[in-house]
Amino acid sequence: MPMEPLILRHGGSVGWIEVICGSMFSGKTEELIRRLRRAQIARQRVEVFKPRMDRRYSETDVVSHDENALRSTPVDSAEQILLLADSADVVGIDEAQFFDMTLVDVCQQLANDGKRVIVAGLDQEYMGRPLEPMPQFMAVAEYVTKLHAICAVCGAPANHSQRLTDEEGRVVLGAADRYEPRCRRCFQPPRPTSTSSLKAPAPAATAPRPELP
């Protein structure tokens, strides 16, 4: 089970940032919901946010791939979170990779104001490269939890999200219809689709045949 920092009331205490990251289908949203519900049980004031563009399962709820849901507030920008989370003890943010770098500064300010901030997001894009702003969050957070899915090919722990379509956008919304988890060995980053890359490789040079007498 992922490590979780001790839940404390924030009356006069210093806040902190928790990061939950990993590939698709690794349980990031599920873990976020679990922590937020525990905070609610502890009678803390909880506010949950997600990017408005993410309507895959619900327009308003934070929903895991297992369809576990928690009511949230969709926002268009990170700055809105500052205005809406003023009275919260605990702030949860899902799909952080769909926000810009401003979200890091917003969460820093919330933590400095004594709030517990829990951020969940994808840490790599479909090419296997770091996906902002998650690397920056991992650098400033007090607690980082890295989750793994199960490789759809071999069953090993999966750290990558394999895109199954030909779409080239760095961020393409989707679920099992567009992605599956892959381990390092089974992950195949898409190849460039430029004209030059589609040319067949030149045949290997062969030694000349000896002349017959």
Swiss-Prot record:
The active site is at residue 95. GO terms for biological process: DNA biosynthetic process; thymidine metabolic process. Residues 185-213 are annotated as: Disordered. It is found in: Cytoplasm. It catalyses: thymidine + ATP = dTMP + ADP + H(+). Its main location: cytoplasm. GO terms for molecular function: ATP binding; thymidine kinase activity; zinc ion binding. Residues 193-213 have a biased composition (Low complexity). One of its GO terms (cellular component) is cytosol. Keywords: ATP-binding, Cytoplasm, DNA synthesis, Kinase, Metal-binding, Nucleotide-binding, Transferase, Zinc. Zn(2+) binds at residues 151, 154, 183, 186. The keyword Cell division does not apply. ATP binds at residues 22-29, 94-97. Pfam families: TK. Its EC number is 2.7.1.21. Belongs to the thymidine kinase family. Homotetramer. PANTHER family: THYMIDINE KINASE, THYMIDINE KINASE, CYTOSOLIC. NCBIfam families: PRK04296.1-1 (NF003296). This is Thymidine kinase. It comes from Rhodothermus sp. (strain ITI 518). The lineage of its organism: Bacteria, Pseudomonadati, Rhodothermota, Rhodothermia, Rhodothermales. The gene is tdk.
